[in-house]
Amino acid sequence: MDDAGESLKDPQFCATVQRADGLIIVAPEYNHSFPGLLKHVLDTNLTEYVHKAVGVCGVSAGPFGGARMIQSLVPVLRELGLVTIFWDVYFSNAGQLFDETGQITDPAYSRRVEKFLNELVWMARVLRYGRENLPT
């Protein structure tokens, strides 16, 4: 590609990522990995990711909640300069986990999501301070 993929970027998405201090990626497991479209999106926004916090949630209809997807994705995220938090959320048996309004029906999952979000916010704040105040 002559323009190093610049023509494939979505300007609105790039601007949103640039303004964000952290990202949440929710993706299904696809052939023991993450979907190709997610890889495409990640590869077309390289500079916007450096020193940003990211949390990952896996989704599956089965009992593992996208564990293999997360395991495949984390090294890619680190290579892009994103900082992964240590909490992941595995939405296993996703078809039974949410009610008709999209609310989580299992209180244990609600607690996991709360821990996940708290850790993501903490890491995003720390990294924002670093981006704004420390030399790279």
What are the residue ranges of the model-derived segments?
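Glycine-rich phosphate/pyrophosphate-binding loop and the adjoining helix
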Residues: 83-136
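Pocket-edge positions in alpha/beta enzyme catalytic cores
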Residues: 2-5, 61, 105-108
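Helix-loop-strand module that forms the ligand-binding subsite of alpha/beta enzymes
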Residues: 5-81
